[in-house]
UniProtKB/Swiss-Prot annotation:
Pathway: Cofactor metabolism; pyridoxal 5'-phosphate salvage; pyridoxal 5'-phosphate from pyridoxamine 5'-phosphate: step 1/1; Cofactor metabolism; pyridoxal 5'-phosphate salvage; pyridoxal 5'-phosphate from pyridoxine 5'-phosphate: step 1/1. The lineage of its organism: Bacteria, Pseudomonadati, Campylobacterota, Epsilonproteobacteria, Campylobacterales. The keyword Cell cycle does not apply. Belongs to the pyridoxamine 5'-phosphate oxidase family. Homodimer. Keywords: Flavoprotein, FMN, Oxidoreductase, Pyridoxine biosynthesis. It holds the Pfam family PNPOx_N. Coiled coil: none annotated. FMN binds at R60, T61, V62, L63, L64, K65, F75, T76, K82, Q104, Q139, S140, W184, R194. One of its GO terms (molecular function) is pyridoxamine phosphate oxidase activity. InterPro entries: Pyridox_Oxase (IPR000659), Pyridox_Oxase_CS (IPR019740), Pyridox_Oxase_N (IPR011576), Pyridoxamine_oxidase_dimer_C (IPR019576), Split_barrel_FMN-bd (IPR012349). This is Pyridoxine/pyridoxamine 5'-phosphate oxidase. It is an enzyme of class 1 (oxidoreductase). Catalyzes the oxidation of either pyridoxine 5'-phosphate (PNP) or pyridoxamine 5'-phosphate (PMP) into pyridoxal 5'-phosphate (PLP).
């Protein structure tokens, strides 16, 4: 299939450094709120890239659940492929593709587990079905059929029908602690605007314009 003529024409006015907040987390919050206001589908969905000791990169979509100036938090099974890769190489990259706004945000940094207390707090906020789902799915393992998953779901649902679903020790959150955050805005004639925030040793952030 020849896709050489499949292209979009960017129409936004562009982005200037004077438009940016000096704090990348505040800039992210501004863009994130604008993505919500634009009614984008799951604006908190992002692609997470990790690399294990075999040096083969892996990428998948996960959901951002918390962010502040400490970092960006998502939740997963601690026995999953991504968790094993993070254990072997605690570095990650994330990409938020807000394409309807002609924007994307790329984040790179260190990654680590959050505390059990923080993970428990979020687990208790989830719908009961999602809590059960965390117990049912041995993430990334081969299964024989979907019906097996559904059977296990029903078994656990019946087991805890009159009580709380216990917190699984193999499930919890990770936080990406960024060292680089790049904001990309589409521009006419492919003259896109890219600004890179980099964390310095003194804790301050520098801002540089990058060629598109």
């Amino acid at each position: 299939m020849d896709l050489t003529n499949l292209r979009a024409k960017y129409t936004t006015r562009g982005l200037d450094i004077k438009d940016l907040d000096q704090n990348p987390f505040k800039q992210f919050e501004t863009w994130f709120n604008e993505a919500i206001e634009a009614k984008l589908t799951e604006p908190n969905a992002f692609s997470l890239a990790t690399v294990g000791k075999d040096m083969m990169p892996s990428i998948r979509t996960v959901l951002l659940k918390i962010f502040d100036e400490k970092g960006f938090v998502f939740f997963t099974n601690y026995k999953s492929t991504k968790a094993n890769q993070i254990k072997e190489n605690p570095k990650a990259a994330a990409l938020f593709p807000w394409l309807d706004l002609e924007r994307q945000v790329k984040i790179e940094g260190d990654i680590q587990k959050i505390s059990t207390t923080e993970s428990l707090k979020y687990f208790l906020s989830r719908p009961k079905g999602s809590q059960i789902g965390a117990w049912v799915s041995h993430q990334s393992q081969v299964i024989s059929s979907r019906s097996l998953l559904e059977q296990k779901f029903d078994e656990i649902k019946n087991k805890f029908v009159n009580g709380e679903v216990p917190f699984p020790s193999f499930w919890g959150g990770y936080i990406i602690k960024p060292t680089k955050i790049e904001f990309w805005q589409g521009g006419q004639d492919r003259l896109h605007d890219r600004f890179l925030y980099e964390l310095k040793e003194n804790g301050a952030w520098s801002i540089s314009r990058l060629a598109p």
